Amino acid sequence: MGSPFFILSNKGESQIIVTKSSPILVPKVLFDARHIEDYLRLQYDVSKAGHILQDEIEDYISVSYLDKTENDCLTQLEPRYYQHITTFLYNILHRVIANKAANCLCLSIQDECIHFFLEKDNRLLLVNDIAITSDYDILYHALNILNQYGVDPDDCVVYLHNGNDTLAELLSEYTDVTLLKLT
């Protein structure tokens, strides 16, 4: 497995994009910062957590973390701003792309993992990640997610980050595909 993060630098600030396991989404109306570690414990062992990340994504607070070793190697970067890859791409779609599709599946491939979120009628329905083995594996999961949430592939755009041409071509046989490049 590769690095659990990558770094974007801009005007003296380092933006650290975390690409490890999916964040926990807590509805804003229920979120209490005093219980942030409890939220993470629902799904993860946080005994080695070094830095806890908290972001807003639609009506939710996204909570994830870097372990102590990962965090220690980043302490040399000042100032720094942490964000999970899912939140980062969500913000790009909502702030940068003028005519974002109402029904969309955003896929970000990081090593053997794909991070994704699904929106239907401009409402966030799902944030998760899946271990992957091939482009066909990604195609299967993408179509399965759309089917499970009642999203017609003909009425959906897949926003693809870090995908290859073969994957884009496979997906485009079923739905519209837009490549997201961060450079």
Where are these regions (language model features)?
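Hydrophobic/aromatic-enriched cytosolic interaction surfaces used to assemble or bind macromolecules
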Residues: M1-T183
